[in-house]
C-alpha cells in the first residue's frame, strides 16, 4: 500500500493473496484495514494447471473474497474461461472482473473459441470485463484496426455498462506509450455518446470497485 499512501490519486488497490492458503480470510481481513483496499486479483494465467480456478481450495478462497464484499479480478486466457460462470453462480454477490478481455489471441486472428467462451459469460450480471492489455496481444501490428474486432465484440455482447477501461501500464509500454495506447483504443471504439464514454472511462470502475463518488481513477479526467 506504499504507493497508495504516497499518491492521493490512487483511490483503490486490487492486491494479491494466496487464495489456497488456509488463512486467506485472516490475510484479507488485515488488508481490509487499509481504506483503499478494494479487491484481489486471481492470476490463473500464471498457473501451470488450466483448471486451477476449479480447485476446491481456490473456490474456498474466492468465497472468502465474496464474503467480505470485495471484488475479484481474473487474469485469465481463453482456456480458463469455462470455469468463470461457475464462480459467478457460486458467488452471486461477488463482482468479477475479467482483465484484458481474457487476452484474446489477436495476433493469430483465431478468435472463434474466445468469442464463444466470452459470450457464455454474458448471462451473469456480476461479471464485468476490463478493456485493457489489447495492444500487447496484437503482435507486430498494435493498431486500432487490429484490436477493433475484439472491442466491437465486447461492446456488442456486454454493453458499455459492463466494460471498464484499464491502461495496463507499465506492461502496455511493450507495445506503445501511455498516450498512444489510449488514443488507439479511442480510435478502435469509434464514436461514443458522452454518457457511455464516462461509464467506460471511470464511472463503471467507481461502481464495481466501490470507490468514493467523485473520484477519477488514474486521472481519467485529464487523459488525452
Roles of regions detected by a PLM:
Residues 52-164:
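Catalytic pocket-lining loop regions of alpha/beta-barrel enzymes
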Residues 19-22, 47-51, 104-107, 136-139, ...:
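Short, small-residue-enriched loops and turns at beta-alpha junctions
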Residues 153, 157-164, 173-224:
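Mid-to-C-terminal alpha-helical segments outside catalytic/metal-binding sites
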Residues 1-68, 74, 112, 121, ...:
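Mid-domain alpha/beta scaffold segments of enzyme catalytic cores
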Residues 26, 30, 83, 117, ...:
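Alpha-helical elements of Rossmann-like donor-binding domains used by nucleotide-donor carbohydrate transfer enzymes
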Residues 11, 15, 39, 95-100, ...:
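Short hydrophobic/aromatic-enriched beta-strand-loop microsegments
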Residues 13, 40, 65, 100, ...:
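Conserved, mostly hydrophobic/aromatic
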Amino acid at each position: 500500500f506504499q504507493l497508495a499512501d504516497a499518491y492521493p490519486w490512487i483511490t483503490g488497490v486490487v492486491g494479491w493473496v494466496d487464495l489456497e492458503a488456509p488463512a486467506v480470510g485472516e490475510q484479507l481481513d488485515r488488508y481490509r484495514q487499509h481504506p483503499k483496499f478494494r479487491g484481489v486479483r486471481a492470476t490463473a494465467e500464471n498457473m501451470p494447471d488450466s483448471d486451477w480456478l476449479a480447485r476446491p481450495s481456490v473456490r474456498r478462497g474466492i468465497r472468502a473474497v465474496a464474503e467480505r464484499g470485495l471484488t475479484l479480478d481474473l487474469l485469465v486466457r481463453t482456456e480458463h474461461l469455462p470455469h468463470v460462470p461457475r464462480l459467478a453462480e457460486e458467488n452471486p454477490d461477488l463482482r468479477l472482473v475479467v482483465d484484458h478481455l481474457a487476452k484474446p489471441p489477436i495476433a493469430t486472428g483465431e478468435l472463434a473459441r474466445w468469442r464463444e467462451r466470452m459470450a457464455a459469460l454474458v448471462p451473469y450480471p456480476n461479471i464485468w470485463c476490463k478493456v485493457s492489455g489489447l495492444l500487447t496481444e496484437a503482435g507486430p501490428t498494435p493498431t486500432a484496426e487490429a484490436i477493433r474486432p475484439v472491442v466491437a465484440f465486447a461492446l456488442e455482447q456486454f454493453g458499455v455498462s459492463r466494460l471498464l477501461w484499464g491502461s495496463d501500464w507499465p506492461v502496455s509500454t511493450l507495445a506503445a506509450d501511455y498516450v498512444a495506447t489510449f488514443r488507439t483504443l479511442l480510435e478502435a471504439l469509434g464514436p461514443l455518446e458522452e454518457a457511455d464514454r464516462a461509464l467506460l472511462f471511470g464511472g463503471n470502475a467507481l461502481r464495481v470497485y466501490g470507490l468514493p463518488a467523485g473520484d477519477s481513477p488514474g486521472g481519467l479526467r485529464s487523459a488525452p
